[in-house]
């Protein structure tokens, strides 16, 4: 498989990694009246791409390059924890990382996945998977940023009963931002945070019978 095809597959929302049960805070944002239509969804996605998307992608790119060790308990793990203030967001990250590793074991069995531990962060797992798949670090970053956007967009589509074509048009419009963010993420580790996204992640835990895990 070519590196471009691998990039497309890793960015496919149909991958059985468990990502479809996470909304990236959109469910809580919808419940709180922060995301109510296409315009507010676009604003939310833009904010998420520029913050958590950038940070997660920068960690994945660093793991891919080898500048952050991927082994459980090493710098990759610690740096991701340090950049994820919300315990709920950390748990969601590790759940998605576990799902990605479960699939990656089948695709690249020669890779040492055991060294990542039972619940690696998504950024760490994505970095190792991108390297195993022969991607360049910036393409690994792009797959992370893109799925950060599309996961939340699809969740909002379901929660607000939005027209799928309209939501797709929003993601097309934000594609240049995804590319720019991935390029920035591949340069160096990002260390910003977004208190709103952290609050939404924590408040989601208190919601009764949520549709999404996060």
From Swiss-Prot:
The keyword Cytoplasm applies. It comes from the Bacteria. Its main location: cytoplasm. This is Urease accessory protein UreF. The keyword Chaperone applies. Keywords: Chaperone, Cytoplasm, Nickel insertion. It is found in: Cytoplasm. Coiled coil: none annotated. Residues 83-95 have a biased composition (Low complexity). UreD, UreF and UreG form a complex that acts as a GTP-hydrolysis-dependent molecular chaperone, activating the urease apoprotein by helping to assemble the nickel containing metallocenter of UreC. The UreE protein probably delivers the nickel. InterPro entries: UreF (IPR002639), UreF_sf (IPR038277). Belongs to the UreF family. Pfam families: UreF. GO terms for cellular component: cytoplasm. One of its GO terms (molecular function) is nickel cation binding. Residues 70-95 are annotated as: Disordered. Required for maturation of urease via the functional incorporation of the urease nickel metallocenter.
